[in-house]
Design a protein with these regions (language model features):
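Glycine-rich beta-strand-centered segment in the early N-terminal region that forms part
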Residues: 20-35, 48-109
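C-terminal hydrophobic helical "lid"/dimerization subdomain
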Residues: 1, 169, 239, 269, ...
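NAD(P)H dinucleotide-binding glycine-rich loop of Rossmann-like/cofactor-binding domains
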Residues: 90-183
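Mid-domain Rossmann-like dinucleotide-binding core that forms the NAD(H)/NADP(H) cofactor-binding site
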Residues: 141-143, 147-236
Length: 366
């Protein structure tokens, strides 16, 4: 089988590898398509400081495929099932902070303190390889069977589910309820645009899409429908707070901050101050600066500010059900697909993605 491999000098090649039987707890998947992150080139070239697997390894995070074989101790998955793969693997042991990794991408800290624990590094050594290959060997716990009603959907379209999974984790963390008003900071970005579409599908009565790219926000509103309003942020917290409150028709119930690589927290702060008493702010972005929280304002407003690393294991199944029922239209995604041997072109296209764009690598039929 063919697979992309990243070497210790960060060079990458498409090579032939022998197929192997899945180990205990593992599943061999014939890959159909895998999404390409906008920053994947930077990751696999070592420019973002991620804790990459030992080289050589196969990159790639999520994907769509068909089960070919299962290892011992796998009880529910069967050959022939179409599945969605996600990279978040956490040790299934009764410990307060289980080790976790993102397969094919990085080892992660069990908590926000200290470096990468040896147990996380060991977990990554056991499962180093991702989805940019014709076959992927994955732990059964990161696979979700897709409903038969999605069998006719092209795999390149279904990878859009992975784009939606990250903001879904944030909305679950915040406890989004139908009828609530939602602010999305970073709405013109890769995950932020997905958050806007998803919040409408989940029943938000009003969604304010906030960002700096006015044209991208207007394109998003045209697709998302009449419950979505847009705010082009100015960088002035007081002014932006006023605009957000006005667009929401009053103070909002919750805000999802999902801005990538921000060098200021002004927009995040504006979203916080646009919340009602008891409002919730979920932080999933990657700002490189502190967020100032006033003690009195936090106390007087009963605000909840929380972080969210990723999404629960049942999110792919929830999203698949929404897509199968028609509540979530994956057709709004602008998918650009490349065959496996054109990864370099896919990386270039992914780096230019905006809004609802999706870049996928395809491995064969469907």
């Amino acid at each position: 089988m063919r697979a992309w491999r990243v070497n210790s000098d960060f060079s990458r090649f498409l090579v032939e590898l022998p197929e192997r039987a899945p180990p205990p707890g593992g599943v061999l998947v014939r890959m159909q398509a895998a999404p390409v992150l906008s920053y994947l080139r930077e990751v696999i070239e070592g420019r973002l400081g991620y804790s990459l697997p030992s080289a050589p390894f196969t990159p790639g995070t999520n994907g769509i495929g068909v089960v070919e074989a299962v290892g011992a101790g796998v009880y529910h998955l069967r050959p022939g099932q179409r599945v969605i793969l996600d990279p978040h693997l956490a040790v299934d042991e009764r410990t307060p902070e289980p080790a976790q990794i993102l397969i094919g991408l990085t080892a992660t800290r069990s908590s926000g303190f200290g470096g990468i624990a040896e147990v996380a590094a060991a977990l990554q050594r056991d499962w180093p390889d991702g989805t940019l290959a014709e076959r992927a060997c994955m732990p059964a716990s990161v696979l979700t069977s897709l409903p038969a009603s999605l069998d006719g959907e092209p795999a390149a379209r279904l990878v859009g589910l992975s784009k939606l999974a990250v903001p879904y984790g944030g909305f679950l963390r915040a406890g989004l309820q139908a009828g609530e008003t939602v602010l999305v900071n970073g709405a013109s970005g890769y995950f932020g645009s997905a958050a806007v579409i998803l919040s409408v599908a989940l029943g938000a009565s009003r969604v304010v899409a906030a960002g700096r790219d006015r044209a991208a926000l207007e394109r998003l509103r045209a697709v998302a429908g009449p419950r979505v309003a847009t705010v082009t942020l100015s960088g002035d917290r007081s002014r932006d707070t006023e605009w957000l409150v006005d667009a929401a028709g009053g103070r909002a119930d919750l805000a999802l901050d999902i801005v990538g690589h921000a060098n200021t927290a002004t927009a995040t702060s504006a979203c916080l101050y646009a919340l009602r008493r008891g409002g919730r702010l979920v932080m999933m972005g990657s700002a490189n600066v502190p967020l100032e929280l006033g003690f009195y304002d936090m106390l007087a407003n009963d605000w909840h500010v929380m972080g969210c690393f990723t999404y629960p294991a049942d999110v792919p199944a929830r999203l698949a059900a929404l897509a199968a029922s028609g509540q979530l239209d994956l057709g709004v995604m602008n998918v650009r697909a490349f065959p496996l041997d054109r990864l370099e072109d896919a990386l270039e296209a992914a780096a230019r993605m905006r809004g609802l764009d999706v870049t996928a690598v395809t491995m064969g039929a469907r």
